[in-house]
Amino acid sequence: MKFSLESNHKHARAGRLSVNNKTINTPAFMTIGTYGSVKTMDTFDLKKCNVEIILSNAFHLMLRPGTALIEKFGGLHQLMNWDGLILTDSGGYQVFSLGKDIKISDVGAEFRSPFNGDKVLMTPEISIDVQTKINTDIMMIFDECIKYPSNLSVTEKSMELSLRWAERSKKANYASKTLFGIVQGGMLSLIHI
């Protein structure tokens, strides 16, 4: 990964981010392709719109169409017929958005699949393994997402758990892919990390 600052003015900046010999201009708008496709658009349309990066979701892709199927295609790029950058979110927010029946522990998050009701365990290691197997360019650590507003005690406890999960995500990165962290500390800037 390489980042170069191209220009800056006061609090603004423009740069270029290169990962896996693919480069995007920053700041960048990430087009959403949660399940590995952008609704109503094919890759030709995306290129016409100068899309440089697509955001997909490891949680959803793991559950449907499934990691094994994406691997059979040779990865998410081949499945999507996309040669630009792909960033996959780890699934922390999606677990949170399921609402009830979620068990969060040091191990990970246990929940029921929104598609078929099966019991699913998502851990930092599983999230990184999925993101590696689908061959994304930029992986996000698995973190806990908490409701807003949350008090200092809840926010600190979640931040500490997410930091432990971040360490495990980093250790699980066996393919040494580009791995990004997520700002922790909720809306309480005094504990942002």
Regions picked out by a protein language model, each given a short descriptive name:
Residues M1-Y174:
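Non-catalytic, usually N-terminal nucleic-acid engagement modules in DNA/RNA processing proteins
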Residues M139-I141, Y174-L188:
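Intrinsically disordered, low-complexity segments enriched in small residues
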